[in-house]
Amino acid sequence: MKIVIAGGAGTLGRDLVKHFATQGNEVVVLSRRNVSVEGARVLVWDGRSVSEDWARELQDSVLLNLSGELVDRVPTKANIDLLERSRVEPTNTLVQAARQFGTPKLWLQMSTLAIYGDAGDQILTEASLPANGPRQMAGVAKAWEAASADASSIRKVILRTAVVLQPGTPALNRLVRITKLFLGGQVASGKQWVSWIDYRDFIRALDFIMKDESLNGIVHVTSPNPVQNKTLMRELRRALERPWSPPTPAFLIRVGARVLFRTDPLLALTGRRATPMKLLERGFHFQFGSIDQALKDL
């Protein structure tokens, strides 16, 4: 089987390549940079224009579209424009390429649970409606999904994905760093829900989706056990052998996230309580179902 991964040169992409290549699949990575990715052929593209050099690879492939800049940045208009453009432009280009050079047998379109905005205690399923939330969250996600609406493929799955817990990612590195400095208390009330998935379960879930042809449309790729922020921080302190730390007030998060960490405070102050209904109904088993299991390897 040929698997084409757009945006597959990042941390998560490289682990996906390793997994799929080990299974004997042919893996092609589309990257804006001329880099080496073990287990894959790397084809350079600009994400904006169609070239036969890479577009011909789409015919009868499994296409996984991971394209997009990290959300871990201050939410200025310029940065939000970048977040949206880095997702929408490559997706539009892939849609055009599939029309011109050949239809993938499966289109896996990355998306995010942030499409639901700040959902409070509401339990979110694949039937839940997107929210009119902050543009950098719900707005970008809706534009991203809309760009793939006319994708030409035999089967298409929109992967509304939780926070992927993977060592080495910027957001998790920051949480580990501040917790090691004895600053790992809950954020604000600590009641905001965190939907998450261990990166190994994320990879296994994609494998499962590829093989189960009854899965299509929106699929939540998230652990069945979301936790509140206060639980996440407690388990992180436990994993790193740190004592209780005082809560961080919301106003300090709003200032500190922007000034000290150059990131979006809403990443910590908003939450979503999602469940992977379709995966559970099809019998998918999560190996890392509890947050303490996922944090053991930090």
Task: Please report, for each region that a protein language model flagged, where it lies by residue.
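Active-site Tyr-X1-5-Lys
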Residues: 132-156
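NAD(P)H-binding glycine-rich loop region in Rossmannoid oxidoreductase-like domains
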Residues: 35-36, 41-90
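N-terminal Rossmann NAD(P)H-binding glycine-rich loop of SDR-like oxidoreductase domains
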Residues: 3-23
